[in-house]
């Protein structure tokens, strides 16, 4: 719903509630639909909508009592946990469709340079590539308008098929340009991984006689009598590349966004609708033909446009009995919530199914659009947990958003655009073989190298000047500040080496200018995953939202709230009476205020509370479900586990107990991560900015020294140590007491 007018104030569409977001910023929720106000762009004049999920910086707001009030500097404080490994990452990549079919016609020198930029460890460092097997339109255009794709994705989308009619010989000389790029990639990057994928079967196998889809975009276009011939067509192309060039595709994907109604006759690109049942039938035909080919290639599927459809497709394949014939699951993330992402990750992990984010891109304007896609990348890596992340286009002519280089196919001119450097902030430094580890802030991405001696932190800021206060106390060893390297991309910088950070003990403070992305490389002594321990405090985080934490209110209510690392969010697992000697529980979960989690299943209630008095329902088991996630279940009623009410994940959502059953195929709102606060741990900077004015604000702080912008300039200072600070006014916090000091 777009808000262009003021509606009747008596309607729910005109009623809003305010929720704390980050620091001094809030979310504004519409009562009418339960969604948040936000924009689609950072540009001046952008329209405001009330259909946002509240997860993006463009959904955050600041209230000033003055028309010209200064927006406060925000400090985001959080901990990085090297022991909580999320996934082993294989690397980055891009589709070859359609840019390679154009750039492959260029001079050898220019091809060499753009492929070097693409594959070099000092370039984009990409190693996964998707080769498009063209279907090929009717050369006589009997059922379609000549060059109809020129009105959509451009003539570049016209793919050459290897046959002109059923029974024709293969014309292996076709698609020379895309092939030339692919072989150059292999030359430059011997460890490159290739996937073959199809957007459509050849025109002569279709109902419409047109390779862009059926006359009705919601109906299948491949005739069932051609299933076997199309399967042979795909496998024969794969086998040709193995026999002729020694290049074996790791995977073969026969579908592309096929349950949508995007693909229609005379459309803008090759495309082919397949109902779920049709896909199941085709997989049953394709698998034995591929197995008989002698190739090691496996089938991947099913490359749907959004993650919610990927979840539905996965279930359809399982129900259709063909999931075991699939060796890799692919999804695009053009849309989908983080809840969809964790559903997909959980399903794949349960079946040990490799998972790729195989295509995405985004529009927008300037660096704002580039950073918006970077946030989507962060969401994918943090919640979907793919092994590989794939860009859609490398080169474009008409824009600088859907690509990393821009130029003219005809003139053979090209240049790197800002998006190239934004992507490098991740792809150049997080290499294949790295592990993605846990950081409790959605504007951060953390990774460890295989030797566990280097931490990569990528920090994102889509808004105004921000500081990240990163607690590194969970690492066994930390560097001197001079050993840390940092690189930043902003509207005026492109992977520039910067020194806008400080390290005080285990507290890393990083300055992020307006609309910027920063990568830090830190030599560290990493740790390995361990079992749950007694006498260690944990922050208990819901899988659906890594910025929230299990929280007990003074009145005993248990909810998830913004993670402030407060005493009411710090839980210990204490062995209950009669617990097993092997440390498997049950446990009493008690926070630093002495409140114990208490369920009420015996009375038939789903209620969960935190109380200081004893109860017979204060014992829980913590069972690993999908590491690093766990099920926390009642000891007396083992099938009942901690649950996010109505599967919500926003601040204030009540936590209850609900049945965790085997037939619930995506119970991710009943899964929790236990984040151990070993060593220093503790509060990590400003917990909340309660006042809405820049001139008068209150803050709950960790012990330390803060400037008036809210930045922690000195952590945990002792009463006797001397510290050099610039002249100015500071707030000193010690044991909850704040004092203003002028220097």
Language-model-derived ranges and their functions:
Residues 1, 9-43, 55-72, 528-555, ...:
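Extracellular glycan-recognition/adhesion modules and their associated mucin-like linkers
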Residues 75, 81-250, 284:
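N-terminal catalytic cores of secreted or lumenal carbohydrate-active enzymes
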Residues 229-236, 240-248, 258-363:
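Active-site neighborhood of glycoside hydrolase catalytic domains
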Residues 439-479, 515:
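Carbohydrate-binding surface patches
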Residues 683-743:
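C-terminal outer-membrane/trafficking sorting elements
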């Amino acid at each position: 719903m777009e808000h262009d007018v003021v509606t009747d104030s008596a309607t729910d569409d005109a009623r809003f509630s305010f929720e704390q977001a980050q620091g001094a910023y809030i979310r504004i929720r519409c009562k009418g639909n339960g969604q948040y106000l936000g924009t689609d762009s950072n540009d001046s004049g952008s329209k405001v909508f009330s259909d946002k999920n509240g997860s993006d910086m463009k959904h955050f707001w600041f209230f000033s009592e003055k028309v010209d009030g200064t927006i406060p500097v925000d400090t985001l404080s959080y901990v990085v946990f090297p022991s909580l490994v999320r996934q082993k990452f294989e690397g980055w990549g891009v589709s070859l469709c359609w840019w390679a079919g154009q750039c492959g016609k260029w001079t050898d020198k220019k091809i060499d340079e753009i492929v070097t930029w693409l594959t070099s460890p000092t370039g984009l460092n990409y190693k996964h590539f998707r080769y498009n097997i063209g279907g090929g339109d009717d050369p006589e255009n009997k059922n379609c308008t000549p060059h109809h794709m020129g009105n959509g994705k451009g003539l570049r989308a016209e793919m050459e098929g290897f046959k002109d009619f059923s029974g024709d010989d293969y014309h292996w000389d076709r698609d020379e340009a895309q092939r030339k790029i692919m072989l150059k990639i292999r030359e430059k990057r011997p460890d490159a991984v290739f996937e073959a994928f199809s957007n459509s079967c050849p025109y002569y196998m279709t109902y419409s006689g047109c390779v862009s889809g059926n006359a009705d975009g919601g109906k299948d276009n491949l005739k069932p009598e051609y299933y076997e011939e199309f399967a042979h067509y795909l496998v024969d192309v794969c086998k040709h590349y193995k026999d002729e060039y020694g290049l074996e595709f790791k995977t073969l994907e026969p579908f592309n966004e096929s349950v949508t109604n995007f693909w229609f006759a005379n459309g803008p690109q090759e495309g082919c609708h397949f109902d779920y049942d049709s896909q199941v039938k085709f997989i049953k035909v394709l698998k034995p033909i591929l197995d008989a080919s002698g190739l090691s290639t496996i089938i991947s599927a099913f490359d749907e446009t959004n993650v919610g459809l990927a979840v539905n497709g996965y279930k359809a394949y399982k129900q259709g009995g063909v999931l075991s014939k699939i060796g890799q699951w692919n999804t695009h993330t053009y849309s989908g919530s983080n809840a969809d992402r964790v559903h997909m990750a959980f399903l794949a992990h349960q079946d040990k199914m490799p998972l790729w984010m195989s295509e995405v891109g985004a529009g927008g304007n300037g660096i704002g659009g580039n950073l918006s896609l970077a946030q989507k990348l962060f969401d994918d890596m943090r919640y979907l947990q793919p092994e590989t992340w794939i860009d859609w286009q490398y080169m474009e002519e008409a824009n600088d958003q859907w690509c990393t280089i821009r130029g003219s196919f005809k003139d053979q001119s090209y240049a790197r655009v800002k998006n190239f450097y934004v992507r490098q902030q991740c792809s150049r430094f997080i290499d294949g073989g790295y592990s993605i580890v846990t950081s409790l802030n959605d504007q951060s991405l953390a990774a460890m190298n295989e030797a566990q001696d280097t931490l990569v932190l990528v920090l994102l800021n889509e808004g105004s000047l921000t500081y990240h206060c990163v607690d590194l106390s969970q690492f066994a060893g930390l560097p001197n500040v001079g050993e840390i390297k940092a690189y930043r991309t902003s509207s005026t910088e492109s992977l520039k080496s910067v020194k806008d950070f400080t390290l005080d003990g285990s507290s890393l403070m990083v300055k992020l200018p307006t609309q910027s992305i920063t990568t830090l490389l830190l030599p560290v002594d990493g740790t390995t995953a361990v079992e749950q321990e007694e006498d260690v405090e944990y922050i208990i985080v819901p899988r659906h939202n890594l910025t929230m934490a299990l929280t007990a209110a003074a009145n005993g209510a248990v909810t998830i709230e913004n993670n402030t690392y407060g005493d009411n969010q710090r839980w210990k697992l204490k062995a209950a009476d009669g617990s097993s000697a092997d440390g498997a529980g049950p446990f009493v979960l008690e926070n630093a205020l002495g409140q114990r989690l208490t369920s009420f299943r015996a009375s038939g209630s789903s209620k969960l509370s935190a109380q200081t008095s004893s109860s017979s329902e204060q014992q829980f088991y913590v069972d690993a479900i999908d590491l690093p996630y766990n099920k926390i279940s009642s000891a007396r009623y083992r099938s009942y586990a901690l649950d996010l009410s109505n599967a919500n994940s926003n601040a204030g959502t009540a936590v209850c107990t609900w049945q965790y059953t085997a037939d619930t195929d995506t119970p991710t709102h009943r899964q929790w991560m236990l984040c151990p606060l070993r060593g220093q741990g503790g509060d990590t900077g400003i917990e909340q900015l309660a006042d809405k004015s820049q001139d008068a604000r209150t803050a709950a702080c960790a012990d330390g020294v803060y400037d008036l912008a809210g930045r922690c300039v000195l952590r945990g200072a002792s009463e006797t140590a001397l510290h050099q600070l610039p002249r100015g006014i500071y707030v000193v916090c010690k044991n909850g007491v704040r004092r203003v000091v002028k220097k």
